[in-house]
Amino acid sequence: MLIESFEDVVRYLDGTYSPSAMPSIKDTRTYRLSRERELLKLLHNPEKELKCIHVAGSKGKGTTSAYLASLISGGKAKVGLYMSPHVYDYRERWMLSDPKGEDPISFFKDDDYIKAACIMQSYLDDHKKLKLKDGISPTQFELYTAYAFVLFKYAKIKVAVIETGLGGRLDATNVIQSSACVLTHIEKEHTDILGDDIKEITREKCGIIKSGVPVFALKGSDEVNSVIEKECEKMGSELFFCDHKTTDLSPLAIKGDSAYTDFHLAVTVAEHLGIKCDEKNKCRTYPLTLPARGEVTLEKDRIVILDGAHTVDSIKELCKNVTTIVQNIRPHDTINKQKDWYSSLENNAENFRTVIPLIDKYPRAVIFSCLENKDFIGMFDVLIKEFDVIALTSIDGYKKSNMKKIVTETEIVLNKAKQRRVKKIIIDDDIEECLAKIESLECPDIKDSVKVIVITGSFYLCSSFIGG
C-alpha cells in the first residue's frame, strides 16, 4: 500500500499483524520476546542505536515517563517517548520532547511518522516474512514497539524513554539494553497473566532489570521492596529507592499526590543520568499534561472528569482528588488544545464558575467500566463509598470488558458492603446513554442535580467517550 498520511501509517501497521494471532489473555505461552527480536532483526535492529530508559509499574508509569522525557530534553537532547495506550490520537504512543519545542512533549511531524512506516514497509514488503519462526505473526503491540524504534532512529533521536505495555519480563519492550530501569508504584493487576501474588507480580515487573544497570524504584510495601532488593542483588544492579512525595510546591498541571511522586522520581532518575534539573528545566516540565489524567470538560452545566485510573490505589486517589481537580480546571492541555471538543471548556466557562465553590455539596456520579482482567471488585468497593450514582457500562474493541461479570459482581459487592454512599445504580452498554440517564435522573434520594461526573476505570473507556 502507498503510505502518504498518518492515517495510512495506522492502516499499514494495523493491517500488517494478524488479529487471529493476538495473544490470548489466558495463554501466557504466546507472550515471548523471540518474535520481537526476530522482527527487529528484519528491521536492522534500530533499538541498538538508542540510549533507552525503561519504565515499568502498575500505575504512574506514563506520567513518570513523560516527565522524564521532558527533563532529559531540558539537557538539550531530543528525546523519544513511547507509551500506551493512546486516548485521543494514535500519535500519543510515539512522541517527542524537543528542547527547542514550545511544549514539554509533542507529536513528531507527520513526515517523520510517514517516513518511518515507509522504511518499515520496505524491510517487510514480503508479508510472509512476518510469519516468524514460531509460525505466529507479530502482535499489534509488537509491531507498534518495532515501529517506535524505527521512528526514533530515522528522526535522529539518540535517547528514548520506553514504557512497558504489560508486566516487564515478557513485555515486547524488554528487548532493549537500557541505561536505567525505573519501577513506579506496583500493586495487584493483570493477575491472570502476571500472577495472583504481589511478590510474583513484582518479580515480573523487575524482569526489565539488566545486569549492572541502575534501578530507581518507588518505595512500596515491605513485600514489594524485598523482591526489588533481591532482584537487583541478583543482577548486580545498584538500587535507589524513592519516597512518595505527597507535599510539593511545584505547580504541576497534573494534580494529585501521585503526580508529585512521579515528578520526584523522574527528577531523581534524570539527575543520576547527569541532567541538570534546575528551576529552568523544571519550569519547562510543570505545564506537562497527558490525556485522561484528571482531565476536565463540560457537558452542559456539568463538569466531567476523565481519568484512566485502573487500579484500586489509583481509584482511591482519584476519589480523594475530585475537588482539587475541579478547582484547578485548566483551559488547555499540551496534546489536545487543538481539538474542538476541548474548546467547550472555554466556551462554557461562565456556566460553572458559580458551581465550583459549592462542588462538594452536589451529588456526584461516576461512569465506570474496566477490562476483564482488572480488579473490578476492589475498585467498585471504593466507588460505592464516594459517589451517589454509579453507571456501569462496557468497553468495546480488542480489549473488552465483561458486562455480565461486572453486573453479577456488582450485586455481590453491594450485598456485602457495610458502608456505602451510592443511591442509584445505572446499567447500560452505551456510555452516551449512561450520561443521558444521569442528566435526566429522577431519584427521591438525590435532591439536587448531579454537577460532577467522573468517567474512569480504563483509558479505553475515556477514549470511547470522546470517540478516540
PLM regions and their residue ranges:
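Acidic, Mg2+-coordinating active-site environments of NTP-dependent enzymes
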Residues: 50, 127-133, 155-163, 178-280
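Nucleotide phosphate-binding/pyrophosphate-handling subdomain across enzymes
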Residues: 159-164, 171-182, 187-190, 200, ...
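Phosphate-binding/switch loop-helix module in NTP-utilizing enzymes
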Residues: 119-166
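Short, high-confidence coil segments that cap the C-terminus of an alpha-helix
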Residues: 156-158, 361, 448-450
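Active-site-proximal loop/hinge segments that shape catalytic or ion-binding/gating pockets
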Residues: 458
